[in-house]
Amino acid sequence: MRLSRRKFIKDASMSTLAMTALSKASPAAFAQTAHSSDEPQENAQAQQFSALADKPPVRPHPLDLDENFIRMPLAPEDAIYGRLQGAHIKEFVREIVAVSNKCRDDGIRFWGRMAGTKYDDMTEALVESKFRDFGLEEVHRQYFDLPPQVFPTSWDLKATGSGQTLDFDSVVPFPRSQLTPGPMDLEVVWVGLGTEADFVGRDVRGKLVVVYSWPMPGVVEHSASYNGALKRAADKGAAAVLLNVAIPGNFQTAVILRAGSLPAVSMGSEDTARLRQLLEQGPVRARLQITTETKPGLRDANVWGVLPGVSDEDIIVMAHHDSYFGGALDNASGVAVMMGLAEYFSTVPKSQRRRTLKFVTTAGHHAGSAGTQWMHDNRATFLGKTALMINCEHVSVVQAYFDRTKPELRKSTNIDARRWYVNGSDKLAEIVVKNYKTFGVTIYDVMDPYTTGDMSHCDHDAPAIQLIESAVFYHTDHDTPEIVPAPGLEAVARSFAKIIDQINLHDRQELLG
């Protein structure tokens, strides 16, 4: 029996997490186990490498990461796909992220390309303009009414103990957090990973519970989401929750979880370490306040553009456009590849396009995915002659590692592998996987059994493929163009272009699963 991705990671990781909990779960418990050493635990790692650090430095040799990413050369028979250039596609990424940055610069504290906001509308206008520039036909917006949207507007967290008061720059409310009933003055309790064992002997009723969560690989999934830590805190009577997804640095994060009906915030690792050190000195109280605004009457849109083909069948290339923070990986990278493909195929004569190509940036992924839900609801007619759907989502991100000597992330010259999905025949899967290999698109060893992301609403309604990777930078304020390698965009765009060309040699019936 094939395990789901969630269960596989959960089962494979919990033993490691349990070992991590020995040093992280409780400041008090940690102090009790530290008597065997005369040195503080936090110095142990530094001591391990002190002899190396004492060596005289050698001449440094800087590395230009952008110039050294792995890039596959084109075979002569694939020279036509050389027109899809990563540097050009990345300019689309920068243009889209600039919309998010304007939101931030306009003073919106919970910033990004949020569904239903004017910045979301600006992104749609940008895509619409590109489609017209490329000469696409039937360019239009398809609007959807959104349910009332909740936006955190202001928040604050201060911690006081042992004669000190700390402020924290990296605090962000969960996007779906409850607001606080005015300022809350709460005792702080550290519960480590938040397993049932971590709660033993701790009274959390009416208190602010701090959960330390191991990234798996980041904000999208982490130990607290697997082990039910937040629900456990709520069930045991906590008044509020503070979550740290233990990414090195001091990342601001948008955590898509609920803590029951509790107010909930996330905080970066450096700020969390400061809070933990304060707890190690004695009791700590926190002042927490979250204010939200509910906005009814908002709308979002699919933006469509069409390149007619010679038959009545079609291929749909989609990518959602809303985001938290800069959203370069999520999902300017996908929208940029989708636009790059639209531009590329606009230069192909209609007589050489067997099927109509429909390009769409889809509406409100973080607000219910109205755009792809509409496709599902109208699948009998809208998708009845669709030969392939391609979802472009989080398609290129630098491969990063945890440094072994200090709490830092280290980037590499490689590009993260993507989770991949094929709904269709063995022939379709053969075409897809072969072209990923041809163009150097790194993928996981086992296909996802289902899609995550925006296409999950309609992925069973027609032959479909997807690439997606929700890396450590996903849903953080470090999701910037700098972590989106141009060669990764290029490789994905080229592979999708050739997949389109090759499936056009096959009848739709041959592509169905």
Predicted region positions:
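Metal-dependent peptidase/peptidase-like ectodomains
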Residues: 310-312, 362-466
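Noncatalytic luminal/extracellular "stalk/propeptide" segments of secretory-pathway proteins
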Residues: 91-94, 103-208, 215-216
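N-terminal export signals
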Residues: 7-31
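Soluble metallo-hydrolase cores and metallopeptidase-like ectodomains found primarily
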Residues: 168-201, 256-329, 340-343, 347-348, ...
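N-terminal hydrophobic or amphipathic helices/low-complexity stretches enriched
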Residues: 39-120, 125, 129, 134, ...
